[in-house]
Amino acid sequence: MKKSDLIIVRGAGDLATGTIHRLKKSGFHLLVLETDHPAAIRRQVALSEAVYSGSTCVENVEAVRIESVEQMRQVWEEGKVPVLVDPKGESIRLLKPKVVVDAILAKKNLGTTKDMAPLTIGLGPGFCAGEDVDVVIETKRGHNLGRIIRQGSAYPNTGIPGIIGGYGAERVIHAPAAGRMKNRSKIGDIVEAGQVLAVIEGEDGSTEVSATIDGLLRGLIRDDYPVTKGFKIADIDPRKEELANCFTISDKARCIAGSVLEGICEAVE
């Protein structure tokens, strides 16, 4: 492949954004595919926000929502990244990209197959390298984070977040009830354990969402987003002094991005 060839990235959450950012800065032509209602938590560093706002910028890379593939080249000419609502990846067959990166991070394969492109890359569990994709990238924190897997799968999803500042599961908040989020806090706020971060308005009334630990509110799902019970809705960083982390791509995302870039560069002529 050549640098001018099309790469399609499925998903634009915070981890996917790390990959999109790296590939854009490396000079590749990208098209990003998203759902019509992305559920990113770390919204300040998720290019998926362009679906709602029309455009968004993360670390000097701007993403712009497009309504059809015909608008893609114009966005490229402006030096930006086009984002198309296409959750099923129907545009992939039409555009015939050289690379498809599944960065949805759904912990399962939502439909990416090896025949979509000459090179297919899946991030995290749910893919088997050599079967449904060519390459899998490990996304679990630890010694193997970012490892390129050419045969087999990434570690299965444990449901236990990686440790940050001595906290794991405690730093991630899930919806205690179903309903619509009514946020009382914003990303970047210093919060205390027990503090009400949001209220979920459901059919059976209102349910408060409280901070689980003291720290920095690093992620919070969009206001008015409809959630189901158990849905991931917030993320607290116990390192209160790390405000910049709320607005910059994480070490984990950058590590994964480097591995994706390596996998693609091996195929560049």
State where each predicted segment sits.
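Well-ordered secondary-structure scaffolds
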Residues: 1-269
